[in-house]
Swiss-Prot record:
The keyword DNA-binding does not apply. This is Nucleotide-binding protein MS1759. It comes from the Bacteria. Keywords: Nucleotide-binding. PANTHER family: UPF0234 PROTEIN YAJQ. Disulfide bonds: none annotated. Signal peptide: none annotated. GO terms for molecular function: nucleotide binding. CDD domains: YajQ_like. Belongs to the YajQ family. GO terms for cellular component: cytosol.
Length: 163
């Protein structure tokens, strides 16, 4: 029976390139001259730390980072940006988390979405991915379009196609 997996992965190499590009843009921006502003990637924790001297500049850093991510084909919904900033002395900072894998809650939403559509496919939650199995390729393609059209707060990739 044909099947495929729904996953949500980010290539850390591309994230590293996006952070480097954002830092390069930051060094050429006139409004950040003489200002202590840093964008750092922590690959172990899968976080990006943004630090600068004012709350407004922090929002500008986020816009620079999102722009750099989009240029590297990283979906901006894969960045979990906190609403509140931390304030330490004269510096403001935010720690942006990268969404890797599908959480159980989101996997259950995907499963419910597919089952409610009455498609002739079965879904299984397997850790941080969802396996979709069906009798025909057309049903699987309909399931892919259904998940792509749903706004579930993070980007999904479809891989491991089997016939």
């Amino acid at each position: 029976m044909p099947s495929f997996d729904i996953v949500s992965e980010i290539t850390m190499h591309e994230v590293n390139n996006a952070v480097e590009n954002a830092n390069r843009i930051l060094s050429t921006r006139y409004d950040f001259r003489g200002v202590e502003a840093v964008i750092e990637l922590n690959e172990k924790n899968e976080t990006i730390k943004l630090t600068t001297e004012s709350d407004f500049q922090l929002e500008q850093l986020i816009e620079i980072l999102i722009g750099a991510c989009i240029k590297r084909n990283i979906d901006s919904t894969s960045l979990d940006i906190p609403t509140e900033s931390e304030h330490h002395g004269k510096l403001y900072s935010k720690e942006v988390k990268l969404k890797q894998g599908i959480e159980t809650e989101t996997a259950k939403k995907i499963t419910k979405l597919i089952k409610d559509s009455k498609l002739k496919v079965q879904t299984q939650i397997q850790g941080e991915q969802v396996r979709v199995t069906g009798k025909s390729r057309d049903d699987l393609q309909a399931a892919i379009q259904l998940v792509k059209g749903a706004e579930l707060g993070q980007p999904f990739q479809f891989n491991n196609f089997r016939d």
